[in-house]
Amino acid sequence: MSKPLRIIFAGTPDFAARHLSALIDSHHEVIGVYTQPDRPAGRGKKLTASPVKELALEHNIPVFQPENFKSDEAKQELVDQNADLMVVVAYGLLLPQAVLDTPKLGCINVHGSILPRWRGAAPIQRSIWAGDAETGVTIMQMDIGLDTGDMLKIATLPIEATDTSASMYDKLAELGPVALVDCLSDIADGSAIAQKQDDELANYAKKLSKEEAKIDWTMDAIAIERCVRAFNPWPMSHFSVEDKAIKVWQSRVESYTGDATPGTIIQADKTGIYVATGSDAIVFEQLQVPGKKAMGVQDILNSRKEWFEVGNTLN
């Protein structure tokens, strides 16, 4: 077994907490945890600790929550810990070069894509929307660029036809910690091999917006169905009926060669609500109307049949 590393962990959401849990269970020593400051959450806007902070406190690991690393105090706090390595997973703060240079072995990051494809904030969602056959995690040595560092380990898995961003998030949250612990063993014993990224193959996974999630009926049905899966659980693909926003939870593609205007309902029964698109038809199987939970199409038609009459146009 390789020599234990003195590790600082930096992360914030549940995805990061699962990686921290794997480090705690490994033979390495987590000497400190950095996470975003407590934020207001819930209806009462009560200050709430991040999942990473909660896990660290459960294991009596010191927690640090700077707003940024601009102050000399924050930088010195990091220096004083004398870490071998910093592991960064969905931290949410930009790390200046001075921070990247502080640990003896620098900083590594777990990124939710097969780099250099899908650098940026929303790699899981963009990979589904693009119709990629696979995705994975890349563990890279961090540099000052946006997900541009040398790659140390890549682990992949297929994107299934029914995968949503929610399901892929869970799968990568299982894949990532295993790859991370393996990578740490390689770093500790000196066998890790850094591979440079090919910048010509890179593309950018920009943050999602609610505007993108509004269905464009002129797109082909395959693209719309991918959007439905990519935007689940947020911001949710949606369309409008009588100024009511309807969220789409589940859909499928059916062949259609008619000439109905995109956005027109061409069939509505217990098998689904069929809507013409730029190519073929998108069939809605599960929808959510305002103020209600997601419902199967039969329940929707029983309660809102007038909204989904054949010939109606959706916005």
Curated annotation (Swiss-Prot):
(6S)-5,6,7,8-tetrahydrofolate binds at S113, I114, L115, P116. Its EC number is 2.1.2.9. InterPro entries: Fmt, Formyl_trans_C, Formyl_trans_C_sf, Formyl_transf_N, Formyl_transf_N_sf, Formyl_transferase-like_C_sf, GART_AS, Met-tRNA-FMT_C. It catalyses: L-methionyl-tRNA(fMet) + (6R)-10-formyltetrahydrofolate = N-formyl-L-methionyl-tRNA(fMet) + (6S)-5,6,7,8-tetrahydrofolate + H(+). Pfam families: Formyl_trans_C, Formyl_trans_N. One of its GO terms (molecular function) is methionyl-tRNA formyltransferase activity. PANTHER family: METHIONYL-TRNA FORMYLTRANSFERASE, METHIONYL-TRNA FORMYLTRANSFERASE, MITOCHONDRIAL. This is Methionyl-tRNA formyltransferase. It comes from Aliivibrio fischeri (strain ATCC 700601 / ES114). The gene is fmt.
